[in-house]
Amino acid sequence: MGPVRELRVAVTAEDYEEALRFYRDALGLPVIESWENEGGSGAILDAGRATLEVLSRSQTDFVDEIEVGRPSSGPVRFALEVEDSVEAAERLEAAGAEREGGPVVTPWQHRNVRLRAPDGMQLTLFTVLD
C-alpha cells in the first residue's frame, strides 16, 4: 500500500454555496480545484498541513468540558490552528457560525474557541500560546 499521500476530509453540505462561502471566504481556505457537472458541484480547498487526531470518548468529553462546559462532540470535529483564535471566531460568527464556547485557555496552553459552522460541523479554533 505505501504511505498515505493526502488526507482529504469530504464534507457533504445541504447548502453547497453557503458552505463554500463559509470555508473559502470566511475561513480563508483557497480553492485548489472546483467542478460542476451533472452529478453536482464540488471544490477542494487547501487547509494546510493535515493530521488525524484519534481520541477516546473520555478524552473528547474532557476537551468538550474545557471548551464548552458539557459533552457536545459528535464523531468528527475540525480543530484548526489559527494565528488569533478570537479574531478568527468573530470573523466566522459574522459569516454564520454559532459560538458554542470560549475563548478558553486549555491546560496544554492553547486559546480555544468552539463554533458550529452553518453546515453543522463543529470547529475548534486554537492558538498556541507562547
Listing of model-derived features with the role each one plays in the protein:
Residues 18, 85-89:
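Short, conserved charged micro-motifs
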Residues 19-24, 92, 120:
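Conserved active-site tyrosine of GNAT-family acetyltransferases
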Residues 122-125:
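Short glycine-/small-residue motifs
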Residues 1-8, 30-79, 89-116, 128-130:
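Vicinal oxygen chelate
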Residues 6, 13-16:
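Onset of an N-terminal alpha helix
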